[in-house]
Swiss-Prot record:
PANTHER family for this protein: PRESEQUENCE TRANSLOCATED-ASSOCIATED MOTOR SUBUNIT PAM17, MITOCHONDRIAL
Subunit record text: Component of the PAM complex, at least composed of hsp70-5/ssc1, grpe/mge1, tim44, un-4/pam16, pam17 and tim14/pam18.
Transit peptide residues according to the UniProt entry: 1-86
Pfam family membership, one: Pam17
Family: Belongs to the PAM17 family.
Function of the molecule: Component of the PAM complex, a complex required for the translocation of transit peptide-containing proteins from the inner membrane into the mitochondrial matrix in an ATP-dependent manner.
Taxonomic lineage of the native organism: Eukaryota, Fungi, Dikarya, Ascomycota, Pezizomycotina
Keyword check for Cytoplasm: no
Segments of this protein annotated with the region Disordered: 71-101
Bilayer topology: Multi-pass membrane protein
GO-annotated biological processes: protein import into mitochondrial matrix
Signal sequence coordinates: none
Keyword list, A-Z: Membrane, Mitochondrion, Mitochondrion inner membrane, Protein transport, Transit peptide, Translocation, Transmembrane, Transmembrane helix, Transport
Name of protein: Presequence translocated-associated motor subunit pam17, mitochondrial
Length: 267
């Protein structure tokens, strides 16, 4: 009996001691300060990788694009400001440059020839009409002279070899040659008439040149754009050849404004 009881007690003590040892081992494994330390992965301190603070390649590319866009905007603003300042300081077109140059030339010519009679616009248009008539008369006269002289020369048979080479009837060939002589005389007429007119009106020659420069500068400045013309809206006297008075010039300006109004409003 004693032996069985002692055996039972020993077994109970061993089991009790083994049951108490198991949680102690667990506590030592969980706690690194325990004397029963175990080299496990949980007990070893894990190394924490520091977060990288440098930007990625995508962020750098986006920043570079933003900087390039800002630089382009600054360049555009600078160019627009410089162009606006330069446009405010210089004339807007070549027509204005021509008008300013013509006015400066007129002032210099009038100062250089102070003793000459002053030529107003009405007198200028009258002299211009007279010169045109003289040139037209000389064109007719030179046409008659050259055509008659050419016909007389051709009738002598000087150009028979040339007439034979033309694949037409001899009468038609001679007629064409005579007409060509007449056309040459028509082209020579304005030059001859201008020379005669300048000789007769020599005191107005310098003033007329100045007035012509001013007149054509005004025509170039105020005339319309011919590219916008059409069959229903033709260009009204593009070169100002029909202007023969101050009233005619004012009517020409009204025609230019009417053309622009019709072009913009499609009336």
């Amino acid at each position: 009996m004693l032996s069985s009881t002692a055996t039972t007690m020993l077994r109970a003590g061993v089991s009790r001691s083994s049951g108490a040892l198991q949680p102690m081992l667990l506590r030592s494994a969980a706690c690194p300060c325990s004397p029963f330390s175990m080299n496990t992965k949980l007990s070893q301190p894990t190394s924490v990788r520091p977060l990288s603070t440098s930007p990625s390649a995508l962020v750098l590319r986006f920043r570079a694009q933003q900087q390039a866009q800002l630089a382009q905007q600054q360049l555009r603003r600078a160019s627009s400001s410089s162009s606006s300042s330069s446009s405010s300081t210089r004339p807007r077109s070549d027509a204005e440059l021509d008008a300013n140059a013509a006015e400066a030339a007129a002032a210099a010519q009038s100062a250089a020839h102070a003793g000459e009679p002053v030529l107003d616009w009405n007198t200028f248009f009258k002299l211009r009409k007279t010169r045109r008539r003289v040139q037209l008369a000389f064109s007719v006269i030179m046409t008659l002279i050259t055509s008659g002289a050419g016909g007389a020369v051709l009738s002598t048979g000087v150009a028979d070899a040339m007439v034979a080479q033309v694949p037409l009837e001899p009468m038609f060939a001679v007629g064409l040659m005579t007409a060509s002589f007449g056309a040459l005389g028509w082209l020579m007429g304005p030059a001859m008439g201008g020379m005669v007119f300048n000789a007769l009106k020599s005191k107005y020659r310098g003033q007329m040149e100045i007035k012509e420069g001013q007149f054509f500068a005004r025509i170039k400045k105020h005339r319309v754009d011919p590219s916008a013309s059409s069959m229903g809206n033709p260009v009204p006297d593009f070169y100002g050849e029909k202007i023969s008075s101050v009233a005619g010039y004012r009517q020409w300006l009204k025609d230019q404004r009417a053309f622009n109004k019709k072009r913009t409003t499609f009336v």
